Design a protein with these regions (language model features):
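Phosphate-binding/catalytic loop of phosphoryl-transfer enzymes
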Residues: 1-64, 168-171
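ATP-binding/phosphotransfer module of carbohydrate and carboxylate kinases, centering on a glycine-rich
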Residues: 14-21, 58-171
Length: 171
């Protein structure tokens, strides 16, 4: 028995974008934030399958799960899907909100680099499909990260496998 993000990470490490990397952090962005660790090519889930879970770490006035999931869009009086459609139409306000979201993701990535120093971070989940709209804010935030060599050596990508969690669970 395992959690959905651990299954996603296992699937991505065996069949997707984390394949061939020794150390990876896989993050699902959706109604919440899930994360898992691939260390030395193997899923590391800890004693209770929660190793690497960073969504509940305090951030600003709430936690990372609030600011890096669909919950933050409720506070913006919109939804991720609405913003995705509007951004695709070139709506400046929607693009600005995605940029703001990207800044929060950049802070999350900074935390991941400090804690785990992975070779690759793979995003999955319903919000990952909008990476093209929030990656600018993410990378802009990472410009202030004190160890730029770590940022330069890190690959940040999204999963192209729709059923990575199923593949991971079946492995």
């Amino acid at each position: 028995v395992n959690n959905d993000c651990n299954c996603f990470g296992l699937g991505v490490s065996l069949f997707g974008e984390a394949q061939g990397y020794r150390d990876a952090v896989c993050v699902t962005l959706g109604t919440g934030v899930g994360s898992c660790l691939i260390i030395d090519g193997k899923l590391y889930s800890g004693q209770n399958t929660g190793a690497g879970e960073i969504g509940n770490i305090p951030y600003l006035d709430k936690d990372y799960e609030y600011y890096c999931s669909s919950r933050v869009f409720v506070g913006m009086d919109t939804t991720g899907k609405e913003l995705f459609i509007k951004a695709g139409e070139g709506d400046a306000e929607a693009l600005a909100k995605w940029d703001e979201f990207g800044v929060h993701i950049g802070k999350l990535v900074s935390l991941i680099i400090n804690a785990y120093d992975p070779q690759v971070i793979v995003f999955g989940g319903s919000i990952a499909g909008a990476f093209e709209y929030f990656k600018g804010g993410t990378y802009k935030e990472l410009e202030s990260f004190p160890y730029q060599r770590s940022v330069q050596r890190l690959k940040i990508t999204t999963s192209s496998i729709d059923n990575a969690a199923i593949l991971g669970a079946a492995s």
